[in-house]
């Protein structure tokens, strides 16, 4: 059906916004006439494909709306969004953006974002149901002024919460008669054996014992390795000590971790390109037919293997968090998204705002979530059948076609763009296979690897990923954050590569960190944490 041919039936007026009558909860179309919504979408597909996308058409026809898309590529979406707000040329609705808590407060208090509280109370039945189920979520989304300015996409993903993983080539371990490393010393010996023992059997010393990449999902080696010395998520570098916010990167344990990683690097056990290569560079090494990669830090192993080389990933298993020389170990824990994709701006009319919040409410339903991620029923997925069991051994609610993972064209879904509500009940209700290394068994494999090695190994207290500050504090923290984090990352690489020495240059490094007003930065975050708690 043409996306402009929207069927209409019946009206039940529960109130009006302008001249358009907005229907009650659960009634579709949403209004007594079609409403056009101009929305910003950071999109992994072209605008033309998005307009003709089957899920787009499904939402438009179901809700009686017409999308007018303002798009940016996934790589430029963050920058584009910031430029739109800076210029004032933003649309009425941000549907797939990346609004951080600081930006939500800044734009909200400047009047650029509409508070959503009243709209949710009036039109957001599904949102209110979710808030009742998860009161901590509503608390986390509420800014210090009491307003909710944006909504996140909810994806309760166990392996994502513990995505800071090291994957190791177990066929190499078996060939060299090595055990899975559990300590930093054991990892050193394993990597040394990978370098010297010719585990790929080609007679050349071409093995790369450990690699990673920059600017991809948990591919930086320092996140996993440093957490054998002090907590490090490679994001804000905070650790918690009895309610006190501290900076890992100024502690003696950080220095010890840098010295350890430098040892690995100086002995050729770490890929020399690890601080410069992109994910594409890591993939090129992972899929080489002569099998040169011993281990890699990456959120999930299929990120490194394309569909043509998917069988190679079967050789890799996760390494548990390593125990360091002082007996410390920690799994990185990422409890939630650090940003929110959905907001309504001051450019929206009352009609558009009412329709937009009902759009958000619908996208949070299971019906919309399943179709958003997996497309129409009976193509890529169907309901479960007798004998199919889920992650917990219960009758499966859904079954996913194994061909979904290798399909190159999927213009019948949004693939998690926009809003969705994929809680653990939904994620873990899909049928699992007996073979965790098969395409259809991959989600089950990630679940089991995470459960085996990482769950409950995080510190008892971690700094929240999603936290609000008041307007002035958010502005100040934003100004301090970039130079502090850039300084930490630059010096981290210099210490690891041997440009700086942890014995002779450490004190100067710490002094430089404090000159960037680290004390004030921690003070701001401490105040925000106290308010959050």
Feature-to-residue mapping (PLM):
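Short alpha-helical segments and helix-capping/turn motifs at coil-helix boundaries
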Residues: 21-25, 76-83, 99-102, 134-137, ...
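Loop/turn elements at helix/coil->beta-strand transitions in domains of secreted/extracellular proteins
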Residues: 34-37, 63-66, 88-93, 112-114, ...
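Generic, well-ordered alpha-helical scaffold segments in large soluble proteins
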Residues: 58, 62, 80, 84, ...
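Short beta-strand segments
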Residues: 39-41, 212, 297
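Extracytoplasmic/periplasmic substrate-binding proteins
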Residues: 105-106, 215-237, 262-426
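Conserved N-terminal structural module of periplasmic/extracytoplasmic solute-binding proteins
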Residues: 1-186, 236, 245-247, 351, ...
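Conserved small-residue motifs centered on glycine
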Residues: 8-10, 15-24, 42, 366-490, ...
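Helix-loop-helix "hinge/cap" segment bordering the ligand-binding cleft or interdomain interface
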Residues: 117, 144-220, 237-288, 342-378, ...
């Amino acid at each position: 059906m043409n996306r402009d041919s929207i069927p209409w039936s019946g009206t039940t007026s529960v109130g009006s916004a302008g001249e358009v009558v907005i229907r009650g909860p659960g009634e579709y179309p949403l209004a007594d006439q079609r409403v056009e919504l101009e929305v910003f979408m950071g999109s992994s597909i072209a605008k033309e494909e998005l307009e003709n996308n089957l899920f787009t058409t499904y939402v438009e026809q179901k809700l009686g709306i017409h999308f007018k898309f303002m798009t940016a590529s996934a790589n430029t979406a963050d920058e584009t969004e910031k430029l739109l707000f800076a210029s004032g040329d933003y649309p009425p609705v941000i549907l797939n953006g990346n609004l951080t808590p600081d930006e939500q407060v800044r734009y909200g208090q400047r009047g650029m974002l509409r508070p959503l509280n009243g709209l949710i109370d009036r039109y957001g039945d599904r949102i209110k149901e979710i808030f009742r189920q998860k009161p901590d979520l509503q608390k986390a989304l509420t800014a210090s002024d009491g307003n909710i300015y944006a909504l996140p996409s909810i994806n309760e993903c166990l392996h994502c919460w513990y995505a800071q993983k090291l994957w190791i080539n177990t066929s190499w371990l078996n060939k060299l008669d090595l055990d899975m490393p559990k300590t930093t010393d054991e990892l050193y010996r394993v990597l040394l054996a990978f370098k010297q023992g010719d585990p790929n059997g080609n007679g050349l010393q071409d093995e790369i014992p450990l690699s990673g990449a920059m600017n991809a999902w948990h591919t930086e080696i320092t996140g996993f390795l440093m957490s054998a010395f002090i907590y490090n998520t490679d994001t804000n570098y905070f650790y918690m000590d009895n309610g006190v916010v501290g900076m890992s990167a100024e502690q003696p344990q950080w220095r010890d971790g840098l010295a350890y990683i430098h040892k690995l690097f100086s002995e050729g056990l770490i890929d020399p390109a690890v601080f410069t290569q992109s994910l594409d560079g890591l993939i090129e090494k992972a899929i080489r037919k002569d099998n040169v990669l011993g281990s890699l830090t990456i959120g999930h192993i299929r990120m490194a293997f394309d569909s043509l080389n998917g069988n190679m990933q079967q050789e890799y298993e996760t390494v548990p968090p390593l125990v360091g020389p002082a007996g410390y170990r920690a799994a990185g824990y990422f409890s939630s998204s650090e940003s929110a994709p959905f907001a309504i701006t001051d450019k929206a009319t009352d009609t558009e705002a009412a329709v937009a919040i009902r759009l958000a409410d619908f996208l949070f339903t299971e019906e919309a979530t399943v179709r958003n991620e997996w497309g129409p029923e009976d193509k890529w997925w169907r309901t479960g059948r007798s004998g199919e069991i889920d992650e917990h051994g219960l009758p499966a609610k859904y079954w996913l076609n194994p061909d979904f993972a290798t399909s190159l064209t999927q213009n019948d879904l949004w693939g998690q763009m926009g809003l969705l509500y994929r809680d653990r009940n939904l994620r873990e209700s899909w049928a699992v296979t007996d073979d965790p290394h098969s395409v259809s068994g991959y989600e089950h494999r990630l679940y089991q690897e995470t459960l085996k090695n990482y769950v409950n190994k995080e510190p008892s207290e971690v700094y929240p990923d999603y936290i609000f500050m008041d307007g002035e504090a958010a502005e100040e923290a934003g100004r301090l954050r970039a130079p502090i984090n850039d300084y930490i990352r630059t010096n981290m690489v210099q210490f690891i590569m041997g440009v700086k020495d942890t014995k002779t240059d450490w004190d100067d490094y710490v002094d430089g960190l404090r000159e960037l007003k680290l004390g004030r930065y921690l003070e701001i975050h401490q105040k925000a944490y106290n308010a959050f708690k």
